[in-house]
Amino acid sequence: MNISRRRLLQSGAFVAAAPALNAAGLNVVTLAQAQAAPEWRHALSLFGDIKYPADFKRFDYVNPDAPKGGIARQISIGTFDNFNLAVAGVKGTIAPAVGLIYETLMARSQDEATTQYGLLAESVSHPDDHSWVIYRLRKDAKWNDGKPVTPEDVLFSMESLKKYSPMYSSYYKHVVKAEKVGPHDIKFTFDAPGNRELPTIVGELTVLPKHWWEGKDSEGRKRDIGATTLEKPLGSGPYAIRDFVAGRSVTLERVKNYWGANAPTRIGQNNFDEMRFEFFRDTTVSLEAFKADQADWIIESSAKSWATAYDFPAVTEKRVVLEEFPINDSGRMQGFAFNIRRELFADKRVRRAFNYAFDFEEMNKQLFYGQYKRINSYFEGTELASSGVPVQREFDILKEVYGDIPPEVIAKPYENPVGGDPEKVRENRRQSTRLLKEAGYEVRDQKLVDKNGKQVSVEFLIDSPPSERIVLFYKPSLERLGIEVTVRTVDTAQYQNRLRSFDYDIVTEVWGQSLSPGNEQRDFWGTEAADVPGSRNTVGIKNPVVDKLIDKIIFAKDRETLVAATKALDRVLLWHYYVVPQFTYGFSRYARWDRFSHAPLPKYGRSGLPSLWWYDKEKADKIGKRS
């Protein structure tokens, strides 16, 4: 999967049942016993060629002579109370800075869609049927306390992450055995052959230091990897936590004598001596902090702010640069997600009625300055998005999983209702009323009631002011149908707790999608994940056809089949109206103080911040000292 799957998955936690691995008491066998003559590879690619040869020195898109030094200050919205990655999404709120502390077995190339090269691992081997994979660790890979990274660390990481993290438990559910098969070699055996993606996703395993987690803290207490912690963790990565203020800030410093400084996948990257993460409760305060030069860059998610809030003197004086970076590495679905565990939303007609009530076109004009487009796919922005009617391979796949394909799935393309003018809005309202009546609801005294005469009521659960603006625009349309609508804004901790326990009617959800989807689809839409606390199956989907299509994606033997199966899944999800699709932009918006530089950015790297940039002293001197 491109876009680093970890980045997508760590946006939330999800789970499915999986057998636990036991790293204790493993028998060490010889490599010859594990595989008579393994073919060792320096890279993995799901589909397509590998660009860089085994002896490559660096990625083409980095500046190998980038100066090291300087400070980079960035903004995070929300708070944190945890540095333990193993319980992210289950307990506490993880600090985003933790991602720069640890490393994975492989590292993604940002100028290829689906290719990984060795990081902690120097080479990898797997058979043609992808039934197992062996990773060979670099002999010079070290933790930042000087101890070597070992197979025992890798086994401990797999076991711990599967045990304590719903995200990893589901993600690695097909890994049924992990064993040390040589001084530097770890073999992972899978539950079935044919899953091309499994060697790659094992390569994305975050490796944790066993000796540190099994040791004691500064007060003599045994560490617990199953609990949250604010003890500064040991990593193998280019940065370490220097200091922090709980919930407010984290400062990282570049590790002196970092083992991987000259590794091909690291040269020209991680150039800042210090990186500071400042946490703000909301975007209004964070923008003011940026304007006051208390942060070096800000990612702007608000169309209104992008259109109206960046006219302060530093912009007109060109001391602050506004840039948009294309999002080529992923697709997305963002929408109002129904909790179909609730009786009201178990009926597809009700869900569809809510979609008819959403006037995106008017919202786009009034709130977003016409910047957005409506999302029409769960894989929006990629070749994986369904369109038209299913043909050829996609049709055949739908026939295989359905038997008799429902007419609506094949008769016409999925289309969202279009509003924007009074006549269209009135027609959409009539359609909503018709669907609700078919579902057994009727209007009495301007209230939509069920068969017992109880008014239909829904609560939108949100955790940010920008989300509140959107819901408040949508709210009157639902109220005109006779629905009682409550908007509940809570803090991040409450929001996460209610998500984990499925205590909501409707939430805004975002599912990031890679260019090569696979096992994570089970966690997004699969039956096994539907009722497990912490699942990313926010909707609660339990659909045998969806499960079959996910398997078609996972076990696709070629790119053509994967694309066709993904389009089929997209089509089925759309026609079940599990969400009210919202909107997308296709670019990331950044404002930054002009004290940094970068080489030409790779196609799949977005902004490249912070890893590909460096502090430019000449530019910094021109715009003056920081506040």
Language-model features: where?
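Ligand-site clamp/hinge motif
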Residues: 138, 227, 258-310, 352, ...
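Surface-exposed binding/hinge segments that line
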Residues: 136, 170-218, 237-245, 389-405
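Ligand/substrate-recognition segments at binding pockets and active sites
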Residues: 56, 246, 286, 299, ...
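Gly/Pro-rich hinge or "lid" segments in bacterial periplasmic/extracellular proteins
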Residues: 96-114, 159, 203-276, 281-285, ...
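Aromatic-rich, solvent-exposed beta-strand/loop patch
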Residues: 118-125, 144, 149, 189-210, ...
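Extracellular/periplasmic solute-recognition and catalytic clefts
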Residues: 177-180, 242-253, 278-342, 349-353, ...
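N-terminal lobe/hinge region of extracytoplasmic solute-binding protein
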Residues: 36-129, 159, 234
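Detector for C-terminal structural segments
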Residues: 8, 14-16, 20, 27-29, ...
